[in-house]
Swiss-Prot record:
This is Restriction of telomere capping protein 1. It comes from the Eukaryota. Residues 566-593 have a biased composition (Basic and acidic residues). Belongs to the WD repeat RTC1 family. It is found in: Vacuole. WD repeats lie at residues 180-221, 229-269, 277-315, 337-376, 405-452, 455-493, 849-890, 1146-1192, 1240-1278. A zinc finger (RING-type) spans 1314-1356. The gene is RTC1. InterPro entries: WD40/YVTN_repeat-like_dom_sf, WD40_repeat_CS, WD40_repeat_dom_sf, WD40_rpt, WDR24, WDR59_RTC1-like_RING_Znf, Znf_RING. Residues 39-48, 64-73, 958-971 have a biased composition (Polar residues). Residues 1091-1101 have a biased composition (Low complexity). May be involved in a process influencing telomere capping. One of its GO terms (biological process) is positive regulation of macroautophagy.
Length: 1361
């Protein structure tokens, strides 16, 4: 956009004929260079010795003393530019601008900028059209800057530097010292008319300094006087526009002082009027302006004498006060405008409106006209005292018309000095505190979208409207810039007409926004439409989540504008002069339409106005109470309120913006609906002509779910389970259902593995029954090794003393640490026997722990698979079945490991040390023979039943299947496994040395032992391997066939051949990815005439899946030494020449040329095995840890939140899925999502069972809860009572327990009572989201849990449980 803006501006500057006079080239034929946000063209400050005739002379003599409340004031023609003195830039409509702007619609409206070398704080314009000057004040700087027609600025004088005063004038040292020392400036203002050469500055000092800019060349000092009656720093100062001799100031001491520059009071530092607000600091004070709009076709009758007598102030407490000097003993209006400190305020140029800004980031527009006083009787007391306190003044009326919400505290705001017929067409410029470096211009007709944003390089410190189009601004980088808003692009110019965005989890789809851009102005048609539809609308006001809109009712709004427009339009119709004839023609249609509309509204509502005005204040049908309460309830309850969710409101005291008029006197327990009419379509809230945007949503999961459900409907052969819910239509409902039904965490994961005792005797009979049921489901017989182990460990837990296994395990670990590598030395045979016993004892204990954990994970995986099956999510169902199958394989290996360990410990005749280590190594090789395993015939994917219900068929393997296996074949298979384990480079000896803690001998046992072992065993076992494999394959195929036949009699299953598990189906290609790219010489391996026997018969899927070629490629069935090495790259890796062939079967001498580490890396890659970085173990592709890792990466890449959290919580402790930092961050974000969907019970369960305690604080400290009193509507702070109770507590009284936020210091009433016991809620309390009621935790526990109730105790209609 920046490039387009610069190119457009360049094309505009190079045009030959500019459209307006002031666009011509300035002196010297130069134009301002293009200006960027971060680069400023620094111009040298030029000083002149004198100001010539550009500045009017100072009045030489003072006039006679006049009354302070004089009603005569001059017209303010000097405020506006002299049209004859300088060419006026005529406003160019956007369609005309396109002729010379071309594509430069985004060109900047910045006219010029000037870098100053002094610190700046505030600025104002010199109210002389011919002067073309602004005054800028800062710390030790008070400069006067002049600009030309092209708004190029230069410094004229610096009144804090004596050298710049010119003429070689000599000053005394005291005078020079007074001039150079100046405090930090808070405000600077210039006078009007006869005092337009006066400048008043104020700051951190307690005085107001007044300078005369015409005394630049005089011998005396430009400092006229110093007003020092304030006791603290002064925040604001302002000159009166009508009575130009009046000056007003307000400071931190809470005093507002009025000074008359004609009298002698200011010479003795005594103010003429003093208004004391106590300790409430004054942040800003302004006189009511009296602009002269007569030359612009305005009604001069509005410029009455009363306007120059009024002023307003905004205070630290958020109060907005209006005063009238003719009644100095009282506050005209006292409005609680902001919930925090008020920072600034400004009057409308010609209407009775005030806009205020505060630290709460709100710009509130208030109507303070006389029409309010005509309907509200205000006591007219008279007192001769000129100083009084406003602390006792009651909160009075003030109509809030609209609120502009900003994201930063509003420090400066000013109305655009332009006459408008419609209040909504007024522009407001604002600047904020902090790092927001923009000056934002809003239109009241479009308060949510700014019209212009003047982007500056540093945060703005202040700005001023030079006229209705030019804005001067200063920032923290001491840069003065001039902007022309007519050439500044609006936000609507860059606003796309259609928007397509991705929705969040609430919809998980697309959202389309179609809208008309509209404009920033309000036409008459819009007023008619919006006001006419306000009377019929009603708004409900609930107790907790209520929406209340503030503003004046439509009748008062129309009536107040009637009186103004009736005179203005009539006067405008009668006036047609030469200089404004063109303007009157443009306004003629608008005036006629608006006038007729007001007449029609007046006739229509005249009777209603009379009844409303003359109705007694004390009479009201809906409210009972004292006259003051009824007055507020009647007069202002019909005013809509600003949106704010509060528990309740009161109508007795007018509260801040957050809880203003329209309050209800009834209790929130009985009052649900308000009788207040809503003017949601009123002119000040929703301008006409701007249609509301249309939002269209597309729920993609719902669409895809419907398509998937329609396609799967024809394939269903059975109905859903009886207890399974129907398919949800909403993605949010599915998310909530899955989170509630899935087992997200395992309870054992919460405990530290080091603190888990093996002999935990807390296991009940139910745990044993669950394990027996699992044995029956997976087909293990009662006499199986794992079943025997379960019974033995159960009885052992009952009889064995506590801590025996744990102590044995700790002793064994200590022994291994002390002995180190000497345990396996030949001289320690006795110690090896003891180590064998200890190893067996430790293995049994650890095996029991692993078995218990695996059993729990298997149950959880099965439950999660069933949950996904209930919602027809087949993809996640298969994932969890895949996890369960892998866990079942680990469970079987644990049982096989226990058998091998017992055989090794009981076989004393076997003197070979490799006997123990070989069995241990066999356990570490996960699923070495999955094809011959009985688990391979397990059918977890069969989810159908003959009875028509969709159910997970876990299958069964009978006891006869285990007995049918030939014992001789099993013995041969054991030898084959030993051979396979010893044939790999990761031999059993280095593996056990790593497990025993001796890593030093890993290098000593190298290729020599491996080559010797291979030479001795290969020749004798080469032929037997094939025979054993073929025999076992045929036996397993026959056994599987027989098992399916026998199981069909007891369990209704499909009559199909043996099917493969998910592991065999999905991971077939992952068996040996490295060997799949090598050509295997079958003749060299099996010999001539030998073929492999198929594992299945007939048309079985298993036989087609495991063909002879794929079967020979398995790493545990075909030795790697007999693969063909065909390519030169493969030969180079193995150290072979191109002419070298494969060695014969009896020789493996080529291995001597291969480095051990290189061979390990090469062969592990060819075998498709991964080496664990922690312990160096080999991990096959179907290893559970690798499977969990792959599923975790898949869930993260696809954005499956639930699957990711489940994997982390269930398997992080056992399989180390990812880093702990990522786990904690993921859980914290997931808990935030659960809180967003109000699933607090699931979140509490996760926090209770997760093993990371620091997750418990996730999301804390990020929310701010603000409590408002339901009686007075004010923010509950209770600082006063806290101070008192703290002092008493320090004195020895123990009464701090009474402090809390259950009461309000302002109204001295309890905030809310318990709905059960009707007592103040001092302790732990709960609140209902449905109805907003609350009560003590103990009371609600008794009501819902003990008494079994489901409704709210207050008797409301909501069912909570």
């Amino acid at each position: 956009m920046g490039a387009r803006r610069e190119s457009g501006l360049h094309s505009f500057l190079n045009r030959k004929t500019p459209p307006t006079a002031d666009m011509q080239q300035g002196s010297g034929g130069t134009r301002p260079q293009p200006f960027s946000r971060f680069t400023y063209g620094s111009k040298s400050a030029q000083s002149s010795g004198g100001m010539g005739g550009q500045v009017a002379c100072s009045p030489k003599g003072r006039g006679s003393q006049r009354s302070l409340l004089s009603s005569n004031f001059p017209f303010m023609e000097s405020v506006f530019e002299d049209r004859t003195a300088a060419p006026q830039r005529t406003p160019t409509p956007r369609d005309e601008r396109s002729e010379y702007f071309g594509e430069a619609e985004g060109s900047s409206g910045l006219r010029s900028s000037l870098q100053c070398n002094r610190e700046l704080a505030s600025l104002d314009k010199i109210n002389d059209a011919q002067a073309r000057m602004v005054v800028v004040a800062g710390k030790s700087h008070l400069g006067l800057y002049k600009f030309d027609e092209a708004y190029r600025m230069q410094q004229v004088h610096d009144y804090m530097t004596p050298g710049s005063l010119g003429g070689g004038t000599k000053f005394s040292s005291s005078m020079r010292r007074n001039m150079r020392k100046i405090s930090t400036i808070s405000d600077v203002k210039a006078g009007f008319h006869h005092h337009k050469n006066y400048i008043a500055i104020c700051g951190t000092s307690t005085s107001v300094s007044i300078y005369d800019i015409n005394r630049a060349s005089a011998k005396d000092s430009p400092l006229i006087t110093t007003l020092s009656e304030h006791s603290r720093s002064i925040n604001s100062v302002d000159f009166n526009m009508g009575q130009t001799h009046l000056l007003i100031s307000g400071g931190q001491d809470g005093c507002i002082k009025v000074w008359d520059l004609r009298s002698h009071s200011y010479k003795v530092n005594r103010s003429d009027l003093n208004f004391n607000s106590g300790s409430d600091s004054v942040r800003d004070v302004k006189w009511m302006p009296t602009y002269d709009f007569a030359s612009l076709g305005a009604d001069t009758s509005l410029c009455s004498s009363g306007r120059s007598n009024k002023f307003a102030s905004v205070h630290d407490s958020g109060l907005l006060l209006t005063f009238d000097m003719r009644q100095p003993n009282q506050v005209e209006r006292k409005i609680n405008a902001h919930s925090g400190p008020g920072l600034c305020m400004h009057w409308h140029p010609h209407m009775d409106y005030i806009i205020s800004g505060g630290r709460d980031g709100k710009c509130a527009l208030w109507y303070v006209g006389d029409k309010v006083n005509s309907m509200v009787s205000v006591p007219q007391g008279h007192n001769s005292a000129t100083s009084y306190s406003i602390n006792t003044a009651p909160i009075t009326t003030g109509y809030l018309e609209t609120v502009i919400n900003t994201s930063h505290p509003v420090s400066k705001l000013k109305f655009r000095p332009k006459y408008v017929h419609n209040m909504l067409n007024s522009l407001i410029a604002t600047s904020s505190m902090g790092e927001d470096s923009d000056v934002t211009i809003y239109s009241l007709a479009r308060k949510h979208i700014p019209q212009n944003i003047l982007t500056t390089a540093a945060p703005s410190l202040g700005f001023v409207w030079w006229n209705e189009d030019i804005v001067f601004n200063i920032d923290k980088q001491s840069v003065i810039s001039a902007w022309d808003i007519r050439y500044e692009p609006t936000l609507l110019d860059n606003l796309p007409k259609g928007i397509v965005k991705w929705r969040d989890m609430d919809g998980s789809g697309l959202v389309f926004v179609a809208q008309e851009k509209g404009t920033y102005s309000m036409d008459n048609g819009g007023v008619t439409d919006s006001v006419g539809k306000g009377a019929a609308n009603r708004m409900s006001n609930t107790t907790l989540n209520s929406t209340n809109n503030m503003g004046r009712d439509q009748e008062v709004f129309t009536y107040s504008f009637q009186q103004q427009y009736k005179h203005q339009d009539q006067e405008a119709a009668d006036r047609e002069s030469d200089h404004d004839k063109e303007l009157e023609k443009e306004r003629e249609t608008e005036v006629d339409q608006h006038y007729h509309y007001l007449r029609e509204q007046e006739r229509e509502h005249h009777q209603e106005y009379q009844e409303w005005e003359h109705e007694p204040f004390g009479r009201h049908d809906d409210h009972q109470g004292n006259p003051q309460t009824d007055f507020y309830s009647h007069a202002y309850s019909d005013r809509p309120m600003l949106s704010k969710a509060l528990s309740t409101y009161s109508s007795k005291i007018a509260s801040p913006i957050l809880s203003y008029y329209g309050a209800q006197t009834l209790s929130h327990h009985t009052s649900i609906v308000s009788n207040s009419p809503s003017i949601s379509g009123a002119a000040l809230e929703y301008p006409g002509g701007i249609e509301s945007p249309i939002m269209i949503t597309l729920d993609l999961p719902q669409v895809f779910g419907s398509v998937r459900a329609s396609r799967l409907a024809d394939r269903k052969t059975s109905k859903n389970k009886g207890n399974a819910p129907a398919v949800r239509e909403s993605a949010v409902d599915i998310f909530k259902y899955l989170v509630r039904e899935l087992e997200l965490c395992h309870v054992q994961e919460r405990n530290d593995p080091k603190s888990i005792s093996v002999d935990d005797r807390s296991k009940s009979l139910d745990d044993t029954e669950l394990k027996i049921q699992l044995m029956e489901n997976i087909g293990l017989s009662e006499h199986n090794t794992w079943a025997t182990l379960i019974r033995s460990t159960t009885s052992m837990d009952t009889n064995d003393p506590a801590g025996s296994h744990t102590q044995g395990h700790s002793k064994l670990v200590d022994m291994v640490k002390l002995q180190g590598s000497n345990i396996l030395s030949p001289d320690n045979s006795d110690m090896e026997d003891d180590l064998g016993d200890k190893l067996d004892e430790m293995g049994t204990a650890r095996l029991q722990e692993n078995v218990n954990h695996l059993v729990g994970l298997i149950f959880l995986s099965t439950h999660n698979a069933e949950t996904y099956a209930s919602v027809n999510d087949l993809q996640n169902f298969k994932i969890w079945m895949l996890i369960r199958d892998s866990l079942l394989n680990d469970l079987k290996e644990a049982a096989d490991g226990s058998t091998g360990r017992r055989d090794a410990s009981g076989g004393a005749a076997n003197s070979d040390k490799n006997g123990i280590y070989t069995t241990t190594s066999t356990v570490n090789h996960a699923r070495q023979d999955s094809i011959t395993s009985n688990f391979s015939s397990f059918e977890p994917s069969d989810i159908s039943r003959s009875d028509g219900e969709e159910k997970l068929n876990l299958g069964r393997l009978s006891e006869q299947n285990l007995k049918a296996t030939n014992q001789n074949t099993t013995a041969k298979l054991d030898d084959t496994r030993k051979l396979a384990s010893s044939s790999s480079l990761n031999s059993s000896e280095p593996l056990l040395l790593l497990e025993g803690g001796n890593q030093a001998k890993e290098q000593s046992i190298g290729l020599s032992d491996l080559k010797t072992c291979l030479k001795e065993r290969y020749t004798a076992s080469n032929e037997s391997v094939l025979d054993i494999e073929e025999e076992s394959s045929a036996t397993v195929a026959y056994s599987s066939k027989q098992a399916n036949t026998e199981c069909s009699s007891s369990i209704p299953i499909r009559k199909t051949e043996a099917r493969t598990s998910f592991i065999d189906t999905i991971m077939t290609n992952l068996r040996s990815p490295g060997l799949s790219h090598l050509d295997v010489d079958n003749d060299a391996i099996f010999g001539k005439g030998k073929t492999s026997t198929s594992l299945g018969s007939g048309a079985s899927k298993r036989s087609s899946m495991h063909s002879t070629d794929s079967y020979h490629k398995r790493p545990y069935s075909s030795p790697i030494t007999y693969s063909k090495i065909t390519t030169a790259a493969q030969k180079a890796k193995l150290g072979l020449a191109d002419h070298d062939g494969l060695p014969n079967r009896g020789s493996i001498s080529f291995l001597a040329n291969i480095d051990a580490a290189h061979a390990d890396k090469l062969l592990l890659g060819k075998l498709g095995l991964a080496s664990s970085p922690d312990d160096g173990k080999l991990l096959p592709p179907w290893d559970t840890g690798r499977l969990i890792q792959q599923l975790y990466r898949y869930s993260v890449e696809t954005g499956n939140i639930i699957l990711t959290v489940c994997i982390i919580l269930l398997f992080q402790t056992m399989y180390k899925v990812t880093s702990t930092r990522i786990v904690k961050s993921t859980l914290a974000e997931f808990i935030t999502i659960l809180h967003r969907y109000e699933m607090f019970e699931i979140s509490a369960h996760l926090l209770k069972n997760c093993p990371w305690d620091d997750i418990l604080g996730a999301g804390s400290g990020q929310s701010t809860v603000r409590l408002f009193c339901e009686n007075c509507g004010k923010l509950i702070v209770n600082e006063h009572s806290k101070t008192i109770l703290s002092k008493r507590h320090q004195a020895g009284e123990s009464n701090m327990t009474n402090f809390g936020y259950w009461y309000c210091d302002s109204c001295r009433k309890p905030n809310s009572l318990c709905v059960y016991c009707e007592q103040p809620m001092k302790k732990l309390a709960l609140s209902f989201l449905n109805c907003g009621h609350g009560g003590h935790f103990e009371c609600l526990q008794q009501w819902f849990l003990d008494e079994g109730m489901s409704e709210c105790p207050s008797g409301c209609s909501g069912v909570l449980l």
